[in-house]
Amino acid sequence: MREITPKRIMEMKGKEKITMITAYDYPSALLADKAGFDIVFVGDSLGMVVYGEQNTLNVTMDQMIFHTRAVAKAVKRALVLADMPFGSYEVSVEEGVKNAIKLIQAGADAVKIEGGYDHRKLVKKLVRMGIPVMGHTGLTPQRYLRLGGYRIMGENEEEVEEILRDAKALEKAGAFAVVLEFVLADVAKLVTEEVSIPTIGIGSGPYVDGQVLVWHDVLGLYESSPPFAKRYANLREEILRAISEFRKEVKEGKFPGKEHYWEYQDKETFNRIKENVMRKLRL
């Protein structure tokens, strides 16, 4: 069992800020764990930042299992959280249970489900089975078509009520935490105060119990990123510089240098071997 558990995450509410970052492969997960994050999250955002999709709707269970397995192999300390992709739990509770089990078998410690009140029965069932669940309300990317696109949530009474109802339903169903995405900070603060489980914000202000960002946004791997994401590096430019230099050195015959390859020191030995090989192959 990893050091950080759902129980530990729940105990951090109001005491210590929870840190969460996405990771989609072995090397990024190694670094995230070494950096000390509490939660390493295999998000369905991989559809957009890894596979180039316009949204997360085309992400499959096979993709989530594949990436979860890679991340789980790397992480020794943090809690590994895996997203339930669109279509993996909407049809029925039974279908959701089957797919959640697959992610746990791939190495996840917990699963995340978008939505709250509408999926309370699934959350309750999974928790009873011993599968920890994190909920997700506010802007739910898997339902962005219904929401009218990617936009800030909580701008009217109806949305505030829905967000709070989702969070309370998740709490009652046994979820150990809830993500609040792109929610007005005042609303996120209200939810945080009204539920006993931790709230983890993304684009939802400082009044939550923790924060999550996408790996590629933190490192500046793309030209643009969401307005709520802070860039802590500009690796896109550094990577572009490095690979461009590699290409240039190959074109100019500068790579590989003598320190990057090995050859026979005794050329007579090689020439003898060469002659024998050529003769055997009749070249």
UniProtKB/Swiss-Prot annotation:
Annotated EC: 2.1.2.11
Annotated active site: E181 (proton acceptor)
Binding site for 3-methyl-2-oxobutanoate: D44, S45, D83, K112
Domain of life of the native organism: Archaea
Family annotation (InterPro entries): Pantoate_hydroxy_MeTrfase, Pyrv/PenolPyrv_kinase-like_dom, Pyrv_kinase-like_dom_sf
Name used for this protein in its record: 3-methyl-2-oxobutanoate hydroxymethyltransferase
Cofactor: Mg(2+)
Keywords: Coenzyme A biosynthesis, Cytoplasm, Magnesium, Metal-binding, Transferase
Organism of this sequence: Pyrococcus furiosus (strain ATCC 43587 / DSM 3638 / JCM 8422 / Vc1)
Protein family membership: Belongs to the PanB family.
Catalysed reaction, written as an equation: 3-methyl-2-oxobutanoate + (6R)-5,10-methylene-5,6,7,8-tetrahydrofolate + H2O = 2-dehydropantoate + (6S)-5,6,7,8-tetrahydrofolate
GO BP term (any one): pantothenate biosynthetic process
An MF annotation (GO) of this entry: 3-methyl-2-oxobutanoate hydroxymethyltransferase activity
Pfam family, one: Pantoate_transf
Cofactor binding note of this UniProt entry: Binds 1 Mg(2+) ion per subunit.
Pathway info: Cofactor biosynthesis; coenzyme A biosynthesis
Residues at which Mg(2+) binds: D44, D83, E114
Enzyme's top EC category: transferase
CDD domains for the chain: KPHMT-like
Function in brief: Catalyzes the reversible reaction in which hydroxymethyl group from 5,10-methylenetetrahydrofolate is transferred onto alpha-ketoisovalerate to form ketopantoate.
Subunit: Homodecamer; pentamer of dimers.
Gene Ontology CC entries for this record: cytoplasm
